[in-house]
Regions:
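Family-specific signature for flavin-dependent thymidylate synthase
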Residues: 1-234
Length: 234
């Protein structure tokens, strides 16, 4: 399995990966000039020890690359938490890569996330952020239609601006941004991926990014079952 569909039109695709649970164990063992050729119970105990004691550098030697297609609001939350592999040991580099499609260069038909009538959530009672229970279906139906109308109006203005000769990098100002799907490549260490999962699988994370985190988990865990089990609090 290399792809998981998320939301109405989004997805996460595993593009590539490097290493395994054995990579983590051998990265730790190199300190003693030792190496295992196959994963044993001794290696699994070592991985558990590394995770439990917070010795995270061996987990950075395994790497995953994903292609993600998600609403802009999800992408910007995701970017905030792309910090897990950052150890700043002299390079100032977070050791991650993020490359995203840009409407400065492309004018393909925009795609937008539109929640269904039974997916609109109320504001929380005792918090400034997050959400509460699902709103009544009547209200949800009204909101879905209003959002669709808003998107259609923005698209008309965007397309008209392009036809008038406006450059793509400015024409995009007419697009309703937060629900617009964007596509990016995310390459990160196993430690960074697990850090993201611990942050965004939490019950108080925004629902939409929780769904993407679950997709990342389902694609990652079969590749590094021991390491992910030990590092991620499900």
């Amino acid at each position: 399995m290399t792809m998981k569909n998320v939301l109405d039109q989004g997805y996460v695709r595993l593009v590539n990966h490097m290493g395994s649970d054995l990579t983590v164990a051998n990265a730790a063992r190199v300190s003693y000039a030792k190496e295992s050729t196959e994963l044993t119970e001794k290696d699994l105990r070592l991985i558990r020890f590394l995770a439990r004691e917070g010795h995270t550098s061996p987990f950075r030697h395994a790497v995953l690359q994903f292609e993600v297609y998600a609403p802009l609001m999800v992408a910007r939350q995701w970017w905030k938490y792309v910090v897990g592999s950052s150890h700043m040991e002299g390079t100032g580099d977070s050791l991650e890569a993020w490359n995203e499609s840009s409407r400065r260069y492309i004018t393909e038909e925009p795609v937008f996330y539109v929640p269904k009538s039974d997916e609109w959530r109320s504001k929380p009672e005792n918090s400034k952020q997050g959400s509460g229970e699902i709103l009544p279906n009547e209200t949800g139906t009204k909101l879905t239609k209003e959002l669709q109308d808003y998107i259609e109006e923005g698209l008309e203005k965007y397309e008209a601006a392009l036809e008038d000769g406006l450059c793509a990098e400015q024409a995009r100002l007419f697009l309703p941004a937060y629900g617009m799907y964007v596509r990016w490549y995310w390459t990160a260490s196993l430690q960074s991926v697990c850090h993201f999962l611990n942050q965004r699988l939490k019950h108080d994370a925004q629902k939409e990014i929780q769904l993407y985190a679950k997709a990342i988990l389902e694609l990652s865990k079969p590749l590094y079952s021991s390491a992910v089990t030990e590092l991620v609090e499900e």
